[in-house]
C-alpha cells in the first residue's frame, strides 16, 4: 500500500473530517474498507 493509495481512499472523508459535512460520504466508508 502506498501513500497515494491512502490519499485516494481517504479523500472522500475530508469534508466530514474537517467539519464541512454532517456525516461521512459513502465513498469514505468504502475507501476505509479498501485499506
UniProtKB/Swiss-Prot annotation:
Record flagged with keyword Transcription regulation: no
Assigned keywords, A-Z: Antimicrobial, Disulfide bond, Fungicide, Lipid-binding, Plant defense, Transport
GO terms of biological process kind: defense response to fungus; killing of cells of another organism; lipid transport
Coiled-coil regions listed in the entry: none
Cystine crosslinks: 13-28
Any Pfam family matching the protein: Tryp_alpha_amyl
Known function: Plant non-specific lipid-transfer proteins transfer phospholipids as well as galactolipids across membranes. May play a role in wax or cutin deposition in the cell walls of expanding epidermal cells and certain secretory tissues. Inhibits the growth of F.oxysporum and P.infestans.
UniProt record similarity statement: Belongs to the plant LTP family.
Protein name: Non-specific lipid-transfer protein 1
